[in-house]
Design a protein with these regions (language model features):
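Small-residue-biased structural context
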Residues: 3-249
Length: 249
């Protein structure tokens, strides 16, 4: 399931009329370039690339050139678009859910520390803390729902297709119902991380920032980037394919 994208593959798969979610689905390494331009490819992944460029006065040709010329060593080593759905669900848990759980204690420690030390001179830090706590609690409640309810059902759909049998009816009726809830929670988490980015002026350090301040901002920015890819894999690949598979069966 691993595939290194060649320049030829990249160039022939990008179109201005594709949604930004579809573009990143072709190569998750494109996410870094979209991040640079503030393009929302996860919660807002269903909007066309050209529409976003026009709305935000971005040079579409320049961005496409950057995508097409991405060095091969930076290209994605996973072809997520063609992952088995069960494997993709497992990947999300193993990589992204693990990342969240491992990083929360560190962010808790550092963010609370700089609020105590620098909060008087930088009151915006308390807004950062409030939004971080909101996204933290959202994710800690959200991930078990996926791990214990939605993802096991996706595995059952995959098994049903492989064995040419009808899947047992789930208690939630259709996969669209938990997916709708997961997407709403993704939106909430995405809004909170946007607030953090705005409050920190894109994670710009103040002149009096200490090493703890720097580490905190690095942790928060990495947390945001991982969350964007995490949500993208679900909203733009896993969820639509799970809905299509259930309808097919």
């Amino acid at each position: 399931m691993r595939l290194f994208y060649s320049f030829f593959f990249q160039k022939n798969m990008i179109s201005k009329n594709m949604t930004v979610g579809e573009i990143v689905a072709k190569n998750v390494a494109f996410a870094e370039i979209f991040e640079k331009y503030g393009i929302d490819f996860c919660c807002g992944g269903d909007v066309s690339f050209i529409e976003i460029c026009e709305k935000n006065n971005l040079d579409a040709e320049k961005i496409i050139a950057e995508l097409q010329n991405l060095p091969e060593k930076q290209s994605a080593d996973h072809d997520f678009e063609n992952f088995d759905l069960g494997d993709l669900a497992d990947y999300i848990v193993d990589v992204h859910h693990t990342f969240v759980r491992e990083n929360i204690p560190r962010i808790d420690e550092y963010l609370n520390k700089i609020c105590r030390v620098h909060g008087e001179n930088h009151p915006e830090l308390f807004g950062v803390l409030e939004n971080y706590e909101a996204v933290r609690e959202e994710l800690l409640a959200h991930m078990p729902k996926e791990e214990n309810v939605l993802f096991p059902y996706i595995h059952r759909l995959v098994d049903a297709e492989k064995n040419n049998i009808a899947p047992a009816k789930p208690p939630f009726g259709t996969v669209k119902n938990p997916i709708r809830m997961m997407e709403m929670e993704h939106d909430n988490a995405g809004d909170a991380t946007k607030n953090i980015r705005n409050l920190t002026n894109n994670f710009t350090l103040p002149e009096d920032a200490c090493n703890s301040y720097r580490i905190t901002f690095e942790l928060l920015e990495n947390f945001e980037k991982d969350l964007h890819v995490h949500i993208h894999l679900e909203n733009n690949i896993l969820f639509p394919k799970a809905i299509a598979l259930e309808e097919k069966l």
